[in-house]
Design a protein with these regions (language model features):
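Catalytic P-loop NTPase motifs of RecA-like helicase/translocase cores
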Residues: 39-40, 170-171, 311-313
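Conserved FAD/dinucleotide-binding core of flavoprotein oxidoreductases
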Residues: 84-109, 113, 146-156, 195-285
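Conserved mid-domain beta->alpha element of the FAD-binding
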Residues: 8-27, 31-36, 162-163, 190, ...
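Conserved N-terminal glycine-rich FAD pyrophosphate-binding loop of Rossmann-like flavoproteins
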Residues: 37-55
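Acidic/histidine metal-binding catalytic segments
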Residues: 67-68, 124, 265-281, 340-345, ...
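Conserved N-terminal helical subregion
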Residues: 2-7, 51-176, 180-191, 243-245, ...
Length: 421
């Protein structure tokens, strides 16, 4: 493919910035259009699975990521009383050739932003540009943006436009105007970080409880003020029926009083949920939402990527991971294909079906289903967890999700690289 193509990326989040770096590595020079006027290191933690870390490693970013994140070594599923349901090694310890990295989402975004400016130049990112219209005319994309500072329209043309602008994607809305709000499963998440000594050795992930009431925690680095571990934590509670309209006010400040009483006695060896929550900074409240899988991502020379294409519940650590893989696959196809049309066709064929399967599996709780199985068996039967939920059944749940999502070690370690050169 001609390396002089005009490529526009709507969205300067993790996926859009990874797409820019991937396209640059393949010999192209894209331009990123971001709606906010200034990016800031916002958010809490995110997990990057080994197949996403592989892609960032091949972009030359691994060593620096390990300096600001944590290489996770194991995952532990616990009952609400602290009994171990399932343990498995993660990352390099599990036999992958790349680690699993837990990192602050905002730090990751700012790191990628710096790399885009360093490699592509400061003018590769246009801030404060809100997309308001897009169409393809004679094999050229015509897009309109509103400058948030001046309120003036800006018109651009490109050979291809990537919509990587998140779950509320303006690009997606151009082609699915009647889709409406994201789908809420009735679960609310309260999230924050706390400066504490991370439990279970300092490089472990903890999933405890069941889908209707769950605690998740993992370290994402060091707290700059105290030098302690920066522990990302999430408390989930089912608050209404599946399919109810989601709250209008997203990512709003959370109140401990709304959830902490339900976790008041969640104290186990090395894990004290009330103490962890009490030590936190600001708490944020989110609805757990996704969208139905789409029948089509690509319209003429416009396509979708990341959460704009396949937003999913934050289960199984696959949200950012799948978006990063989208970006790398797209860049590889653009470099190898004979036309933009072939690129878009192959990209969607490679990515749409597998991400749709993950979205639907996450609605069934994905690997976290093992917690519901344990809670149901213990609640309905008499006996030990060992007898009520055989280890072979637990292993089958974990393996099934890895195989469906394409991240069992054999698959990741043996597949060909998406690097062009």
């Amino acid at each position: 493919m001609e390396r002089t193509l005009d490529i526009a990326i709507a969205g300067g989040g993790i996926v859009g910035l990874t797409a820019a770096l991937s396209l640059h590595a393949a010999g192209f020079r894209p331009t990123v259009y971001e709606a906010v006027s200034q990016l800031a290191p916002l958010g809490v933690g995110v997990n990057l699975l080994p197949h996403a870390v592989r892609e960032l490693s091949e972009l030359g970013l691994l060593d620096e990521l390990l300096e600001i994140g944590v290489a996770i070594q194991d995952l532990n599923y616990l009952t609400a009383s602290g009994e171990l349901v399932w343990h498995e090694p993660r990352g390099l310890v599990a036999g992958y050739n790349w680690p699993q990295i837990a990192i602050h989402r905002g730090q990751l975004q700012m790191f990628l932003l710096d790399k885009v400016r360093e490699r592509l130049g400061a003018d590769a990112i246009r801030m404060g540009q809100e997309l308001v219209g897009v169409e393809t005319v004679s094999q050229r994309v015509h897009a309109r943006f509103v400058d948030r500072a001046s309120d003036k329209d800006t018109a651009i043309e490109a050979d291809v436009l990537i919509g990587a602008d998140g779950i509320h994607s303006a690009v997606r809305r151009q082609f699915y105007p009647d889709e409406g709000a994201p789908r809420w499963n009735g679960i609310t998440l309260w999230r924050s970080t706390s400066p504490v000594v991370a439990p279970m050795g300092g490089k472990a992930m903890i999933w405890a409880g069941r889908s209707s009431q769950k605690f998740v925690a993992y370290p994402i680095g060091k707290d700059p003020k105290t030098g302690l571990d920066r522990l990302n934590w999430i408390c989930d509670l089912k608050v209404t029926d599946d399919g109810a309209p989601p709250p209008r006010d997203w990512n709003r400040p959370g109140d401990r009083a709304d959830f902490l009483p339900r976790f008041a006695d969640w104290r186990w060896v090395g894990v004290d949920v009330p103490a962890i929550v009490a030590a936190s900074g600001p708490i944020y409240e989110f609805p757990m939402v996704d969208r139905d899988p789409l029948p089509q991502w690509t319209f003429d020379h416009v396509t979708l990527m990341g959460d704009a294409a396949h937003p999913m519940y934050p289960i199984g650590s696959n949200g950012a991971t799948q978006g990063i893989i989208d970006a790398r696959v797209f860049a590889w196809h653009l470099a190898k294909a004979d036309s933009v049309e072939e690129t878009l066709r192959c990209y969607e064929a490679d990515r749409r079906e597998i991400t749709a399967r993950i979205v639907l599996m996450n609605r069934q709780q994905g690997p976290d289903r093992i917690l519901d199985l344990a809670a149901e068996r213990l609640g309905n039967g008499s006996g030990t967890l060992k007898d009520l939920l055989p280890m072979a059944e637990r292993e089958a749940v974990a393996l099934s999700y890895k195989q469906t999502a394409g991240f069992d070690p054999a698959t990741i370690n043996s597949r060909d690289s998406f690097s062009v050169f």
